[in-house]
């Protein structure tokens, strides 16, 4: 299932690397949120054929801001300088959204993480995207 999802993502029409870098970090995070959510939901459904309420609860463990923030902090040293810059830009971007039920710092790190995923996806760096997604899941499951 995971392999077919990555194949689906790889077949989308993408921007040039320069075009991706010109996007706002919040736009990258917007895309990254969708990519991460689809990845996690696909992974959970492939593992467990359960009622939707159960699937939702399992998904939240991975996609909540606190989990994403912890994940990006733990893998930060494994990122390239360019990837670290994307995370920093996303983390430092001011948003009009007020985080609910999470500290502002965790929310900002989660935004940085999602910006990185959006960047990798739109830049067509699918192997690296898959690597980061897998590392993130490992960190959260520890």
Swiss-Prot record:
Cell compartment(s), UniProt: Cytoplasm
Cofactor: Mg(2+)
Secretion signal, residue range per the UniProt entry: none
GO cellular component, as recorded: cytoplasm
SUPFAM superfamilies: RNase III domain-like
Main location: cytoplasm
Keyword tags: Cytoplasm, Endonuclease, Hydrolase, Magnesium, Nuclease, Ribosome biogenesis, RNA-binding, rRNA processing, rRNA-binding
Family: Belongs to the MrnC RNase family.
Name of the protein: Mini-ribonuclease 3
């Amino acid at each position: 299932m995971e392999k077919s999802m990555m194949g689906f993502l790889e077949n989308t029409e993408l921007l040039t690397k320069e075009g991706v870098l010109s996007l706002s970090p919040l736009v990258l995070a917007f895309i990254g949120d969708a990519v991460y959510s689809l990845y996690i939901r696909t992974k959970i459904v492939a593992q467990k054929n359960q009622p939707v309420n159960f699937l939702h609860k399992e998904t939240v463990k991975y996609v909540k801001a606190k989990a994403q923030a912890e994940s990006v902090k733990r893998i930060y040293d494994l990122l390239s300088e360019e990837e670290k810059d994307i995370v920093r830009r996303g983390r430092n971007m001011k948003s009009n959204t007020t985080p609910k039920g999470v500290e502002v710092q965790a929310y900002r790190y989660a935004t940085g993480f999602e910006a990185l995923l959006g960047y990798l996806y739109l830049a067509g760096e699918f192997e690296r995207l898959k690597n980061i997604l897998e590392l993130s899941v490992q960190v959260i499951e520890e």
